[in-house]
């Protein structure tokens, strides 16, 4: 891994453009299966890598307008690492990548509605990742279900 200062500066520039009460959800590219037991050589998403310097598959960056960066990545799994290669894991990600916090990607659907609460807008790459719009709609529905408890749902997506 390289030093994270240029990536942190890029995240700060994007956060400033988002506005103080907005949030961006940026996924990396998925792995592409070649056949039943192997995948094509992985190529990360350029936007994601530009902001994080992180080139593992199945990861998400959530960036708030205040500059808070949350990474969701694959957990450490020594058995899978034999076949897939080294994984950084959520415990090491904040120190290595300079993000504020990191969680396992398995927690994404549970944590993202809370991160989206009380935001005016949510930004994400439209029509670039299969199924992303559906997931964002699901997260926004979860926020809408909490409106009677005082949560505000983003009005722009």
Residue ranges and their predicted role:
Residues 1-157:
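A composition/biophysics-driven feature that prefers long, compositionally simple stretches
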